[in-house]
Amino acid sequence: MNNQDTRFANQYAIQWFPGHMAKTLRMMEQEIQHVDASLVLLDARIPLSSLNPEIERITARKPKLYALNKADLADPAVTEEWIRYFHEADAGCVAISAKQKGGANAVKAAIERELSGLLARRQNRGMAGAKTQVMLCGIPNVGKSTFLNTFAGSARAKAADRPGVTKGKQWVSTEKFDLLDMPGVLWKKFDSKTIASNLAFIGSIKDDILDVEELAMNLLDEVRRNYPDLVAQRYKLDAETLALPPYELMEAIGRKRGLLVRGGEVNTERCAVMLVDEFRACKWGRISLERPPQRDDMADFAEEDEE
């Protein structure tokens, strides 16, 4: 098989929409009517790809704040570009790391800014003490449970570094806010291979349904285009090796790491798992997989980014 020619053949066909996600979307359509606002967590490495068009549709008529979570894993300069992009579209947006308390405090302050009109009206009506009800939503594995625990100051939600941990809605109450945590949800069909690949790279699609070797090759090919020095430094690669076709590059890295089977062949599956795991753990360095597109408004976020 010619791995270089076929490396994108299957990524375009990635789909993952189990039944509980359809149920979650129906639940969100009901619950959005009873909250004051929505807080949409996006992955700071892929803000566009992690923006679920179904969540956008459901939350469109309520005040909304976007939080670019896992900002500690993303390229800080690119994250600043995204913040400007959202703000220029008059969309509230903050960059956070859910594991850090400062991120939760930034979100609380931003929610109050976004809802300043509502809070002022409540104060005029003698309801200044009423808690603000906010729906927390996003794609799987975007860090909602970790954020919720930091926001609440205690372990209220089960958190894990894999998609699909939160299965049902739950209310979490703090001094000023009642947060409705919704399970992570994707959408029925990814019409863009870029979106599907990006979601797979960060672990928002179950690894069990993916070809891990193809995933690792695609990831290497993507990252070395924009961050060649980080890949070269991590795996001690010279320029000639870094320029190899993706499969040969993966083999070269596996050989350097001693990931061999009997006969001296590289265990490419084991190498692929190592590569994906190290990227997700930020061992390659702080990397962003997409930059803001040249678009005029936030409505374009829901459109396909390419064929």
Language-model region placement:
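Helix-rich effector regions associated with P-loop NTPase G domains
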Residues: 1-38, 45-46, 51-53, 58-64, ...
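Structural beta-sheet core signal
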Residues: 40, 66-68, 136
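Canonical P-loop GTPase G-domain recognition
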Residues: 72-138, 258-260, 266
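Conserved active-site beta-strand-loop modules that form the wall/rim of enzyme catalytic pockets
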Residues: 98, 148, 177-180
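Alpha-helical scaffold segments in soluble metabolic enzymes
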Residues: 106, 110, 146, 218, ...
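Solvent-exposed alpha-helices and their adjacent loops that cap or buttress functional pockets
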Residues: 127-129, 151, 172
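Glycine-rich phosphate-binding P-loop
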Residues: 133-153, 157, 182
